[in-house]
């Protein structure tokens, strides 16, 4: 957990970054790496993103990266997916004008879900609706993004043949 966040923090030492993770061993591992590398511009939160965004100030975010949220592939579980109209409304409220959301998943059907939900929300402008498969470059991207490191979940999805 957190390799992309760690790389981003190193690339942008003047940014204050906030990571959201529920997996406690992943948090511990990332905290250890941050301390070893003396990176001080990252804070971590161990509660669901929906609860965090409900508490953030309006217009307080300039960029949000959501990489490999649980795709909940079974239809009866789709209501558990992070990218939902209510969450997007919270996210929109927290973002300042011109802010960017970057998304990635290794599930093609979830990628389509993300694009459709972003496109339907009046507060977001879809920069690109291009969906690339895991074998494409950059891999598993949903919305146009800059260069980023491959995440553990992205590599796992590629090994398992997820599209």
PLM segments and residue spans:
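A short SAM/SAH-binding and catalytic strip from SAM-dependent methyltransferases
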Residues: 50, 55-82
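A short glycine-rich, Lys/Arg-flanked "PGG" loop and its adjoining helix->strand segment in the class I
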Residues: 81-100
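S-adenosyl-L-methionine
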Residues: 30-63
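Short beta-strand element of Class I
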Residues: 8, 15-18
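Conserved class I S-adenosyl-L-methionine
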Residues: 76-78, 103-121
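Conserved SAM/SAH-binding beta-strand->alpha-helix loop
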Residues: 23
């Amino acid at each position: 957990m957190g390799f992309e966040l760690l790389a981003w923090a190193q690339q942008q030492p003047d940014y204050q970054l906030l990571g959201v993770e529920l997996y406690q061993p992943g948090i511990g591992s990332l905290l250890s790496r941050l301390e070893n590398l003396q990176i001080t511009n990252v804070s971590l939160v161990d509660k669901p993103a929906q609860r965090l965004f409900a508490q953030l100030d309006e217009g307080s975010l300039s960029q949000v990266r959501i990489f490999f949220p649980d795709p909940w592939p079974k239809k009866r579980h789709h209501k558990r997916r992070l990218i939902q109209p209510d969450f997007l409304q919270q996210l929109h409220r927290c973002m300042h004008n011109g802010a960017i959301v970057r998304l990635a998943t290794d599930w093609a059907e979830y990628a389509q879900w993300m694009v459709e939900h972003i496109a339907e929300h009046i507060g977001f402008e879809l920069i690109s609706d291009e969906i690339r498969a895991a074998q494409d470059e950059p891999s598993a991207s949903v919305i146009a993004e800059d260069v980023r490191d491959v995440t553990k979940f992205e590599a796992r999805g590629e090994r398992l043949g997820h599209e």
